[in-house]
Amino acid sequence: MELPPNPGLVDVQRDALYAYDSEAHKAVVNSRPWTNDHKYFKTVRISSVAMIKMVMHARSGGNLEVMGMMQGYIEGSTMVITDAYRLPVEGTETRVNAQDEANEYMVEYLRLCREENRLENVIGWYHSHPGYGCWLSGIDVGTQSLQQQFNEPFVAVVIDPDRTVSQNKVEIGAFRTIPEGIKPFAATNTTTGDGQSVPLNKVEDFGAHSHRYYALDVEHFKSTLDSKLLETLWNKYWVQTLAQNPLLTNRDYTSSQMVDLGSRISKASKSLEMLSTTGQRGPKSDAVDQNIEKLLSEVKQIAAKERSGLMAAEVKGKVFGCGCRGQAEGVQPEKS
């Protein structure tokens, strides 16, 4: 028996982004406006359903990269992502490889979508970068460039599940590559779009290809039904959310941050030693000074996060009497 529609769960104006117009999409694809402007696409809008699916998939992979596809359509210079699905692929800590099984899965998935009258096409792919930020590696640039040659319009989305948990906000980036023959952008520094540094073992790969792609603005949207469902989930799980201790939830990432920071401090110390021996001042010494300032800033950020986590555990323990302070494995907060 089919239930009657609930007016409170549907808002035509708010839910307009879910109304796919296949003819309008085909018209945009056939006109190919991006061929005249390699930065034609400016924004990616991702539905809450697609966002949750991608973040949960990325988080489930742990230290291994995962990969999936995104469905949606084009609206002017905006790429609208309405849904996403994971792929059965083999991932490592540095790359993810799509095999024949994944290609067969994509074909079958799209066939089933058509049967259910879900006509949105695949317009992008996503994968995870656990702990090292949102950017495209050399392999990612090659994959995205190939897709843009044969499957336009296409966008690459990268999610960092570790930084997502650490910062309590989704760490996500959307990118498109620069076509061959177009003058590339100037190479960027060793920080991601949010200002966080790329780990030392990834800096070379990051710097070697950062001029071959550009970032799009990422926005998200949700339907009336999504809002109701998320409100229901919050009312059900707010206790678990409040009881979580970020120091324990993401301690592996914090440890890796400290190890990487130690390696970079050691490298900076050697550079400073060499400059002290030669006594030279100039652009090289200025770069070393800037690097040391950046390292000090990161040390302060990590220390601040640790202090806030310990303070949160202390407050929970006093308010709820749950012994949250002891959950931090005997780590005591600093006394002022």
From Swiss-Prot:
CDD domains in alphabetical order: MPN_RPN11_CSN5 (cd08069)
GO molecular function: deNEDDylase activity; metal ion binding; metallopeptidase activity
Residue ranges annotated as motif JAMM motif: 127-140
Pfam families to which the protein is assigned, alphabetical: CSN5_C (PF18323), JAB (PF01398)
A single GO cellular-component term on record: COP9 signalosome
Record keyword Transferase present: no
Main location: cytoplasm
Residue intervals of the MPN domain: 44-181
Origin superkingdom: Eukaryota
Top enzyme category: hydrolase
Disulphide linkage map: none
Amino-acid positions noted as binding Zn(2+) in the UniProt annotation, renumbered to this chain: 127, 129, 140
Record field: transmembrane: none
Family matches, as InterPro entries: CSN5_C, JAMM/MPN+_dom, JAMM_MPN+_peptidase_M67A, MPN
Subcellular localization: Cytoplasm; Nucleus
Keywords: Cytoplasm, Hydrolase, Metal-binding, Metalloprotease, Nucleus, Protease, Signalosome, Zinc
Keyword Transmembrane: no
The enzyme's E.C. designation: 3.4.-.-
Biological-process GO terms, alphabetical: protein deneddylation; proteolysis; regulation of cell cycle
Function: Catalytic component of the COP9 signalosome (CSN) complex that acts as an regulator of the ubiquitin (Ubl) conjugation pathway by mediating the deneddylation of the cullin subunit of SCF-type E3 ubiquitin-protein ligase complexes. The CSN complex is involved in the regulation of the circadian clock through its control of the stability of the SCF(FWD-1) complex.
UniProt remark on domains: The JAMM motif is essential for the protease activity of the CSN complex resulting in deneddylation of cullins. It constitutes the catalytic center of the complex.
Record-stated family: Belongs to the peptidase M67A family. CSN5 subfamily.
Assembly mode: Component of the COP9 signalosome (CSN) complex.
Protein name: COP9 signalosome complex subunit 5
Species of provenance: Neurospora crassa (strain ATCC 24698 / 74-OR23-1A / CBS 708.71 / DSM 1257 / FGSC 987)
Taxonomic lineage of the native organism: Eukaryota, Fungi, Dikarya, Ascomycota, Pezizomycotina
Name of the coding gene: csn-5
